[in-house]
From Swiss-Prot:
Gene Ontology molecular-function annotations: ATP binding; ATP hydrolysis activity; ATP-dependent protein folding chaperone; protein dimerization activity; unfolded protein binding; zinc ion binding
Annotated PANTHER family: ATP-DEPENDENT CLP PROTEASE ATP-BINDING SUBUNIT CLPX-LIKE, MITOCHONDRIAL, ATP-DEPENDENT CLP PROTEASE ATP-BINDING SUBUNIT CLPX-LIKE, MITOCHONDRIAL-RELATED
Binding residue positions for Zn(2+): 12, 15, 34, 37
Name of this chain's protein: ATP-dependent Clp protease ATP-binding subunit ClpX
Name of the gene: clpX
Biological processes annotated in GO: cell division; proteolysis involved in protein catabolic process
UniProt source species: Clostridium kluyveri (strain ATCC 8527 / DSM 555 / NBRC 12016 / NCIMB 10680 / K1)
Signal sequence bounds: none
InterPro entries for this protein: AAA+_ATPase, ATP-dep_Clp_protease_ClpX, ATPase_AAA_core, Clp_ATPase_C, Clp_protease_ATP-bd_su_ClpX, ClpX_bact, P-loop_NTPase, Znf_CppX_C4
Length: 430
């Protein structure tokens, strides 16, 4: 009988302990694992994960390295890229200092305000930063937010996007970057507090204060409004970098009124809007100007770093079309190569595209739309027309929407060998 009992005695397949020696033994297909081995495995995984987080946070590139990477994707805005690189470096340096230091001095959080005209590169700067730092990133539109209890999105939904982009890894999300666009659209309607409820303006600013400063927020896992019978995801926003962006149309007039010297009669200097250098005016912005625009003092206090961007001129728009790593010209050439068709942009065409973007006042954001309009019919026909080997975009093509088509010598195009693209992982440090 004793021999039969020994045979029936179950053991952990990993440590060899019998079921009598452990609290619990869990069975799998042909294997067993005890509670002690499960706990040990859990500790190993947890330790490795914490090490990974620490490595990511301690290997933050220096400001020069951050700017060098931004230079590859963002044309112009030299001062803005410098300021942003320093601010981001200091943000993650602060995280490391507060995590590792026993010092009484605790470094305060500094969120960033990107201020510049439409199409100047605000969103692109934030996206490129997050990609370089290899941290989760989320974009939110401030115009969709409303104060809790009203139709629209709660501010916590911003954090849900970040959590989703971190694959629900809360610790990674807590070191991410959130870009809130159109922040100028939540300015209160007048400088004086109103007795009526401003649910999409001042109310949203009030709701954003806590997450900007740093709090443990309760986020509904499915989004939407909170209700008392659902579970929440808890996330600490203390180490999340918030970058707010907006065009702030009209703030240049506020700055000008503050900075100009009052002159009367013949000494008065009158400038038209075209003659004003709005970029220079924006560089003189002070927190008081933001208050006059309609941001509340508490909100301005939580975005202490103000980075201004200039409107892009013709030369900058032409450079954007062809110079960055993912320039639009390069993207469209690759698209055509996938159909074994060569695409050529003449310099005169790039100039015409830039001029059209300036006319529309859309900045870099409008360049893609103009190219799409120019090549819509060609992109529709090319896959079906095997005889077309090359497409040339010249100045006339931008206005007539009729690019020059060149047929293959033998009546059928030959395959184009595509270069293999190299994907980049993690931050590139020197």
């Amino acid at each position: 009988m004793a021999k039969n009992d020994d045979k029936k005695q179950l053991k952990c397949s990993f440590c060899g302990k019998t079921q009598d020696q452990v609290r619990r033994l869990i069975a799998g297909p042909g294997v067993y694992i005890c509670d002690e081995c499960i706990e040990l495995c859990s500790e190993i995984i947890s330790d490795e994960f914490e090490e990974d987080i620490q490595i990511d946070m301690t290997s933050i590139p220096k400001p020069v390295e951050i700017k060098n990477y931004l230079d590859q994707y963002v044309i112009g805005q030299e001062d803005s890229k410098k300021s942003l690189s320093v601010a981001v470096y200091n943000h993650y340096k602060r995280i490391n200092s507060n995590n590792n230091s026993n010092d009484d001095v605790e470094l305060q959080k500094s969120n960033i305000l990107l201020l510049g005209p439409t199409g100047s590169g605000k969103t692109l700067l934030a996206q490129t930063l997050a990609r370089f730092l290899n941290v989760p990133f989320a974009i939110a539109d401030a115009t969709t937010l409303t104060e809790a209890g009203y139709v629209g999105e709660d501010v916590e939904n911003i954090l849900l996007k970040l959590i989703q982009n971190a694959d629900y890894d809360i610790e990674r999300a807590e070191h991410g970057i959130v870009y809130i666009d159109e922040i100028d659209k939540i300015a209160r309607k007048s400088e004086n507090p109103s007795i009526t409820r401003d649910v999409s303006g001042e109310g949203v600013q009030q709701a954003l204060l806590k997450i900007l400063e740093g709090t443990v927020a309760s986020v509904p896992p499915q989004g939407g409004r909170k209700h008392p019978h659902q579970e929440f995801i808890q996330i600490n926003t203390t180490n999340i970098l918030f970058i707010c962006g907006g065009a702030f149309d009209g703030i240049d007039s506020i700055i000008e009124r503050r900075t100009r010297v009052s002159t009367l009669g013949f000494g008065a200097e009158i400038q038209s809007k075209k003659d004003k250098d709005i970029g220079k005016l924006l560089k003189q912005i002070m927190p008081g100007d933001l208050l006059k625009f309609g941001l509340i003092p508490e909100f301005v206090g939580r975005i202490p770093i103000i980075v201004t961007l200039e409107a892009l001129d013709r030369a900058a728009l032409i450079s954007i079309l062809k110079e960055p790593k993912n320039a639009l010209v390069k993207q469209y050439k690759k698209l055509f190569e996938l159909d074994d068709v060569e695409l050529e942009f003449k310099d005169e065409a790039l100039e015409a595209i830039a001029d059209e973007a300036l006319k529309r006042n859309t900045g870099a954001r409008g360049l893609r739309a103009i190219i799409e309009e120019t090549m819509k019919d060609v992109m529709f026909d090319i896959p079906s027309k095997e005889e077309i080997a090359k497409v040339i975009i010249n100045k006339d093509a931008v206005s007539t929407k009729m690019p020059e088509l060149i047929e293959a010598e033998n009546g059928k195009r030959t395959p184009i060998k595509l270069k293999k693209s190299r994907t980049r992982k993690g931050p590139e440090t020197a």
